[in-house]
Each structure stands twice: as C-alpha cells, then as structure tokens.
Amino acid sequence: MQSVKSGVLLVNLGTPQAPTPAAVKRYLKQFLSDRRVVDVPRFIWWPLLRGVILPLRSPRVAKLYKSIWMEEGSPLMVYSRRQEKALSAALGDVPVALGMSYGQPSLDSAVQKLLDQHVDHIIVLALYPQYSCSTVAAVWDELARITARYRKLPSMTLIRDYACEPAYISALAQSVQRSFEKHGEPDLLLLSYHGIPQRYADEGDDYPQRCRDTTRELVSALGIAPEKVMMTFQSRFGREPWLTPYTDETMKMLGEKGVKHIQVMCPGFSSDCLETLEEIAEQNREIFIEAGGEKYEYIPALNDEPAHIAMMKELVDRYR
C-alpha cells in the first residue's frame, strides 16, 4: 500500500508588506475585493472602494501600521513566521508552509511549496479559532480556485475551526492567569472578538455562536464568575449594523459606570496585529481611561507561545 505524505498549510489573513500608503493600498484592495468580506453589489462597491475608501484610508492606516511595526516587519507576519518555524520543528518530518489569504506569501505559493515536497495530503489549518464565512470560507474559496487548474489534486483536510478545542482553551486560560498574577485580578475580563455584519449571522453564519462557545469554555476553565466576564465585538466597518455590543462603546460605558480595572483579551486573533496592538491596546485603552477607568491591560495573543504551538500540533496529528 502506497504511503501518504502529509503537509500542513498554515493560513492567516495577511498584512501589508510595508507601513506605506502604497503597500497598504495594494493590501486593502485585495482584501476588500473579496466577496466573502464585502458582498455589496460590484457596481456599487467598485466605485466606492477605488474612488473613496482606498484613497482616503490607505494613508491613515499606513500611519497606524507604522506605529506598531517591528524591526523584523509586520507583527502578524513576524508571529506567523515564528509559528510556522515552531510547528515545523514540533512536527519533524511533516512539511509546513505559511500562506496568507491576502498579500504575501500567497496561498498559491504555499500550496506549490508543499507540492514541490511531494505532499499528497494537505491539512489546512486556518488560524481563525471561530469559523466565519468571511475568513475560513474565504480560504476554501481560494483553494478551490487555485486547484481548479491542476490535473492531479492532492487530498485536503480542511479544519473548520477549533473554538472549543481543550488545548486552545487551556492556552487561553494560561495566558489570562499569567496576566492576573502580574497585574492583579481585574474588576472585569473583557473578551473582544472581531465583528462581522449582523446580516451575515442572520443569513446563517454561526460565527457569533462559536464566539459564545469559546467564551463559555474559557470562563469554565478559569473558574471565575460569569458576571466578571464580558464579550464584545470590534473593528466594525461601514454603516450597516454589526454584531453587538461594540467594544469601543462598551469601554466608554464601563468607565462611566465606575469600573476601574479591566483586562482585555482577543481570543479570535491567533497573532497580534493592527487590530489588537493598535485598536485594542491603544485606542480602546484611551477610551476607557478618558471615561473614568484607571487600570487597563491588554493580554497578548497566543502568538508563538509553546502552548499554542502544542495545540496546533495536536490538531494536525489528529488528521495525519
């Protein structure tokens, strides 16, 4: 019987290649052109994207990226590369290739890298703990497009998500506990997830339920009272309603209500990036403090923590 050689396609969203308006514009154009991300009719969306959004947002977003840029590059890329290297070391003889939904390295190049190593079974681990049509399904769409030109297809295992995986929950809980030990237990632990349009959920995307599942399991693992934990949604874009409660509005409300000490974690982000390091660690901290809060700590993403890499290995081993 012929043996099967498995390989891992490690996927994340992507990032601009430089903190410049031109690089950000290229990245945003690709990202915001995906129908899974924005499903507005093209005859409405194209003029708005090209004539208004890209020219206005690119310079502003480039400044934000510059404020968080690391010596090695974009934080998301730096941590993703570290994850790729650590997972490869943990798996030994199983090839691992990093691909981004948008930007470089592309999913196309990552798949080809695995095929060049004679892989005939690709395990797709998209680092989105909670499934959404705008993230995980977008990866599947792109993989279908890429492989449409192949005569010989590799077999693929697509891991839908891992919102309730015990190893994932344990890694989150360890991170929270370390923060509590370092800064003291806060009045409130706030779990901020990336938002999606409410309409997507109304049409069947189970993302909000998967976020609730993670929150429930994490609260149980921590052994703290449910009323000391709150779940919110961040990073809304555009005018239509998104999942609520909104993180920024909640920060203001908590400060005004007299909450003095909060700690914030973003369980849906596997690597720190603009949305965590700038939006949550900086912008929302300012909102909370200006509204009357006193202590605010952001709990970093799992990044390349050993427990995070061990979780990835456990998932991959299950499907080898």
From Swiss-Prot:
GO biological process, alphabetically ordered: heme biosynthetic process
Keywords assigned by UniProt, alphabetized: Cytoplasm, Heme biosynthesis, Iron, Lyase, Metal-binding, Porphyrin biosynthesis
GO molecular function ontology, one term from the record: metal ion binding
Family, per entry: Belongs to the ferrochelatase family.
Binding sites annotated in the UniProt record for Fe cation: H194, E275
SUPFAM superfamilies: Chelatase
Primary location: cytoplasm
Recorded catalytic activity of this chain's protein: heme b + 2 H(+) = protoporphyrin IX + Fe(2+)
InterPro entries (alphabetical): Ferrochelatase, Ferrochelatase_AS, Ferrochelatase_C, Ferrochelatase_N
Taxonomy, superkingdom: Bacteria
Protein known as: Ferrochelatase
Transmembrane segments: none
Cytoplasm listed as a keyword: yes
Disulphide linkage map: none
Gene3D superfamilies: 3.40.50.1400
Organism, scientific name: Cronobacter sakazakii (strain ATCC BAA-894) (Enterobacter sakazakii)
Top-tier EC class: lyase
Subcellular location(s) per record: Cytoplasm
